């Protein structure tokens, strides 16, 4: 009898468990002292707690959890659970406490949780690249660079990069790369020295300075007639007028005039006079030896069309470290229809805060922008512009960037 009784009890419990699991809302058994019966009551939903059990006349009474407490599942508890206190050191809030969820903390950017501590992500040394980037839950996974790939930096984010294909760049391979160094290519020394920058930051600032605060009628024609050397033809002027706004036309005209008159003594003299500005820009940002990853982040932060990883890699191979950033900014300006580079940089600086970008670099970029907007440079631009056009356009009020 005892054996049959045990089997019957097990079957009964299985039925009760199946019933409470399959029905919705989930149920629980409650003994009702008023009737002496076992009742199937509704459980309380997440975000609430049990106030009163059900009876034969009414359903279970559940009420919302008070502030700073929660329940995250269907339950029969008569109280809510208090939320965890504030996050620990080096942690940030991933999800705030609410009635259905506890406060969730995670390690801040660049760290992962190991036991109870937020440790820095592993940095892969030269010769090893990142196979799996670190997350708030796990450390960085490094892997040795295979044949044909390299990593020349210590980084917690940079993967192994493919060796440069010198022939695709029109260059010769003079030293084969390995796991820690890229292929070394040979090329045109003069092209490498000036890095193919069509308009430098200082020249761009100077050309944009020449835009009057109020465009006078036929301003572009007056400027064309006033510029020395080979004149920009009427067809080119009309094309500039069709494609660009009135504020952008002066910059486009001066850029074309410089290209057509690069061998003119006047242009050479202006470029020499701008050397003071260029030296200062190099002093501010020329020392910023940015990694490929940092250049990628900076280019991603600029508005508009983006510079591709291949273009960044090609620039790193064909430009000196001190000119790489300037070359990429020049490429960005061209790709975005000659957008104002300084305005693009100011936009990027607002967004770099989220990337923990080196403060020394952002500080240098801000100093460069302030320098190119300074009164000293305003006076230099004014002097150069008057030298360039002589005294033929005296009525034009010139504005600094």
Swiss-Prot record:
Cystine residue pairs: 41-54, 44-62, 65-80, 83-97, 87-105, 107-118, 124-142, 145-160, 166-185
Record keywords, A-Z: Apoptosis, Cytokine, Disulfide bond, Glycoprotein, Repeat, Secreted, Signal
SMART domains xref list: DEATH, Ephrin_rec_like, TNFR
GO biological process, one term: response to magnesium ion
TNFR-Cys repeats by residue range: 24-62, 65-105, 107-142, 145-185
Record-annotated Death domain positions: 198-269, 270-365
Induction details: Up-regulated by osteopontin.
GO cellular component, one term: extracellular space
Pfam hit, one: Death_TNFRSF11B
Glycosylation-annotated residues: 98, 165, 178, 289
Annotated GO MF terms: cytokine activity; heparan sulfate binding
Signal peptide positions on this chain: 1-21
Keyword Glycoprotein recorded: yes
Annotated site residues (Involved in dimerization) in this chain: 400
Main location, first listed in the record: secreted
Localisation: Secreted
Record bears the keyword tRNA-binding: no
Functional note: Acts as a decoy receptor for TNFSF11/RANKL and thereby neutralizes its function in osteoclastogenesis. Inhibits the activation of osteoclasts and promotes osteoclast apoptosis in vitro. Bone homeostasis seems to depend on the local ratio between TNFSF11 and TNFRSF11B. May also play a role in preventing arterial calcification. May act as decoy receptor for TNFSF10/TRAIL and protect against apoptosis. TNFSF10/TRAIL binding blocks the inhibition of osteoclastogenesis.
PANTHER family the UniProt entry points to: TUMOR NECROSIS FACTOR RECEPTOR SUPERFAMILY MEMBER, TUMOR NECROSIS FACTOR RECEPTOR SUPERFAMILY MEMBER 11B
Complex formation: Homodimer. Interacts with TNFSF10 and TNFSF11.
Name of the featured protein: Tumor necrosis factor receptor superfamily member 11B
